[in-house]
């Protein structure tokens, strides 16, 4: 062995020894695996010894995925020119937990069938800003977060979420989904979903088939005109609802559709409302800015009996109210402040 090679070997061993005692992961990686990982690092990428399970291949101008070391947990491939996701490149990466493929050129046709399924331990998949026309299938069964915003997705294949009971977050913002794509059939299998983002699609109606576990629903920037009276009957846990920038008018909102004990955050900005809808006493944040509201009638918005009851524990929970961008003139009605005693901010 040459003196140079010997020196490099000694330095590598010393470097590894230093960082073995200061790993960022709670799960210890065996020494021999760490050595193998560092030595197998693709020449196009960066594998920092202090983050031994991570491989950084972002911003490298890559057109294909290099062969990834077997003990990789976190793989960063964003901001490249990758147009094919091959099973061969990831055949050794069976321990992957997190892969970031944002801002590439991957198409549905360029996604090989078994490329994702082989990653049986994957929990986070980022494929935002690509050229996908359909949701990738089959997906890893342990996946918890799937982020596919800003693609060209127009369809959700039936059964694509079958067996996806671990998925809690589904981000499909800024795609081309229409009403017939989001149904009970297409979403079947999402038994533990918490957040769904369907903002900036081409929906004309409220999406069907959302699981009862859903707590956050983002529907901003669609063409929704009405909400069915019983829509939230099957969604008992919804806490945050965003319907900004739709086409909602008073006629499209049944009187008590938002009078839900679970809802904490309701956003209806940039619609066509002329009146404040009925809200629940548990609501904490209400966004009604940039509508066509001319006045706020406290007797309509205030829950029954509140103005006559001075008990603090029975006060409505509203803390933040936006009414700017309407036709309302200051000052804020006194009855409004009397009703919502916990209000901390009113924008008018």
From Swiss-Prot:
Q: Where do the LRRNT domain residues begin and end?
A: 40-69
What InterPro entries has UniProt attached to this entry?
A: Leu-rich_rpt, Leu-rich_rpt_typical-subtyp, LRR_dom_sf, LRRNT, SLRP
Query: Which region is the signal sequence?
Result: 1-26
GO cellular component annotations of the record: extracellular space
| Post-translational modification (record) | Glycosylated. Contains keratan sulfate chains.
Q: In which tissues is it expressed?
A: Expressed in eye, where it is found in the corneal epithelial layer and to a lesser extent in the stromal layer (at protein level).
Disulfide bonds listed in the record: 41-47, 45-57, 302-339
Q: Where is the protein situated, by its record's location annotation?
A: Secreted, Extracellular space, Extracellular matrix
- In the record for this protein, the LRR repeats are positioned at 70-92, 93-118, 119-140, 141-163, 165-189, 190-213, 215-234, 235-260, 262-280, 281-303
Residues carrying sugar: 92, 259, 297
Keyword list (alphabetical) reads: Disulfide bond, Extracellular matrix, Glycoprotein, Leucine-rich repeat, Repeat, Secreted, Sensory transduction, Signal, Vision
Question: Effect of knocking it out?
Answer: Morpolino knockdown of the protein results in increased apoptosis in eye, forebrain and midbrain, and reduced survival rate in embryos.
One GO BP: visual perception
Q: Belongs to which family?
A: Belongs to the small leucine-rich proteoglycan (SLRP) family. SLRP class II subfamily.
**Per its database record, what is this protein's job?**
May be important in developing and maintaining corneal transparency and for the structure of the stromal matrix.
Name by which UniProt lists this protein: Keratocan
């Amino acid at each position: 062995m040459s003196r140079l090679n010997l020196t490099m070997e000694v330095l590598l061993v010393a470097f590894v020894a230093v960082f073995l005692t200061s790993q960022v992961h709670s799960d210890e990686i065996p020494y021999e695996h760490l050595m193998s990982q560092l030595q197998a690092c693709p020449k196009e990428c960066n594998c920092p010894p202090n983050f031994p399970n991570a491989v950084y291949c972002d911003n490298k101008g890559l057109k294909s995925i290099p062969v990834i070391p077997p003990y990789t947990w976190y793989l960063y491939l964003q901001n490249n020119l990758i147009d094919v996701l091959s099973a061969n490149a990831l055949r050794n990466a069976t321990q992957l937990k997190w892969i970031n493929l944002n801002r590439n050129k991957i198409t549905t046709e360029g996604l090989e069938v078994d490329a994702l399924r082989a990653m049986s331990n994957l929990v986070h998949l980022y494929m935002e800003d690509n050229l996908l026309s359909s949701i990738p299938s089959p997906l890893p069964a342990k996946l918890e977060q799937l982020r596919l915003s800003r693609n060209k997705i127009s369809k959700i294949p039936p059964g694509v979420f079958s067996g996806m009971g671990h998925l809690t977050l589904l981000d499909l913002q800024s795609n081309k989904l229409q009403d017939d794509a989001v149904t009970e059939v297409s979403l079947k299998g999402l038994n533990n979903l918490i957040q769904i983002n369907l903002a900036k699609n081409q929906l004309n109606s409220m999406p069907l088939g959302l699981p009862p576990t859903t707590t956050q629903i983002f529907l901003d920037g669609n063409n929704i005109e009405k909400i069915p009276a019983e829509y939230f009957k099957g969604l008992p846990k919804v806490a945050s609802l965003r319907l900004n920038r739709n086409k909602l008018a008073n006629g499209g909102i049944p009187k008590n559709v938002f009078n839900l004990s679970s809802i904490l955050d309701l956003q209806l900005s940039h619609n066509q409302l002329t009146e404040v809808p009925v809200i629940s006493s548990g609501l904490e944040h209400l966004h009604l800015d940039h509508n066509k509201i001319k006045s706020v009638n406290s007797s309509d918005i205030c829950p029954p009996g509140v103005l006559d009851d001075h008990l603090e524990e029975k006060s409505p929970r509203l803390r933040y109210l936006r009414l700017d961008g309407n036709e309302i003139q200051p000052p804020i009605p006194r009855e409004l402040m009397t009703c919502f005693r916990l209000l901390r901010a009113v924008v008018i």
